[in-house]
């Protein structure tokens, strides 16, 4: 008896889910196209993007070497 009741309630719930719209319409539209799907500006910049890109990674790469130099300088190795 309990099993049949559970089957009925499950069938009712699944039929309710199937009647809902699957795709929701959004009122916001973003521009599509080349360079529009990234959160920063690539074309039409004052400085080339490559300069900021490689500069960022160069600073990150240099930090451990600068830290080692400072620590060795403090210890009197240089």
Curated annotation (Swiss-Prot):
Assigned keywords, A-Z: Cleavage on pair of basic residues, Membrane, Mitochondrion, Mitochondrion inner membrane, Oxidoreductase, Transit peptide, Transmembrane, Transmembrane helix
Transmembrane regions: 52-73
Chain ranges on the Mitochondrial matrix side, renumbered to this chain: 28-51
Membrane topology, from the record: Single-pass membrane protein
Annotated propeptide span(s): 75-78
rRNA-binding found in the keyword field: no
Molecular function GO labels: oxidoreductase activity
Predominant subcellular localization, coarse grouping: mitochondrion
Membrane-side (Mitochondrial intermembrane) residue stretches: 74
One Gene Ontology term, aspect cellular component: respiratory chain complex IV
Keyword Oxidoreductase: yes
Subcellular location: Mitochondrion inner membrane
Disulfide bonds: none
Pathway stated in the Swiss-Prot or TrEMBL entry: Energy metabolism; oxidative phosphorylation
Organelle targeting sequence: 1-27
InterPro entries reported for this sequence: COX7C/Cox8, COX7C/Cox8_sf
Any one biological process term the GO annotation gives: mitochondrial electron transport, cytochrome c to oxygen
Functional description taken from the UniProt entry: Component of the cytochrome c oxidase, the last enzyme in the mitochondrial electron transport chain which drives oxidative phosphorylation. The respiratory chain contains 3 multisubunit complexes succinate dehydrogenase (complex II, CII), ubiquinol-cytochrome c oxidoreductase (cytochrome b-c1 complex, complex III, CIII) and cytochrome c oxidase (complex IV, CIV), that cooperate to transfer electrons derived from NADH and succinate to molecular oxygen, creating an electrochemical gradient over the inner membrane that drives transmembrane transport and the ATP synthase.
PANTHER family cross-referenced by the UniProt entry: CYTOCHROME C OXIDASE SUBUNIT 7C, MITOCHONDRIAL, CYTOCHROME C OXIDASE SUBUNIT VIIC
Family: Belongs to the cytochrome c oxidase VIIc family.
Further details from the record: Present with 672 molecules/cell in log phase SD medium.
Subunit architecture: Component of the cytochrome c oxidase (complex IV, CIV), a multisubunit enzyme composed of 12 subunits. The complex is composed of a catalytic core of 3 subunits COX1, COX2 and COX3, encoded in the mitochondrial DNA, and 9 supernumerary subunits COX4, COX5A (or COX5B), COX6, COX7, COX8, COX9, COX12, COX13 and COX26, which are encoded in the nuclear genome.
Name used for this protein in its record: Cytochrome c oxidase subunit 8, mitochondrial
Organism the protein comes from: Saccharomyces cerevisiae (strain ATCC 204508 / S288c) (Baker's yeast)
Gene name per UniProt: COX8
């Amino acid at each position: 008896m309990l099993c049949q009741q559970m089957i009925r309630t499950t069938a009712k719930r699944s039929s309710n889910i199937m009647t809902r719209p699957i795709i929701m319409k959004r009122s916001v539209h973003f521009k599509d196209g080349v360079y529009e799907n990234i959160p920063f500006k690539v074309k039409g910049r004052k400085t080339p993007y490559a300069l900021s890109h490689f500069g960022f990674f160069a600073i990150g790469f240099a930090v451990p070497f600068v830290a080692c130099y400072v620590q060795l300088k403090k210890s009197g190795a240089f």
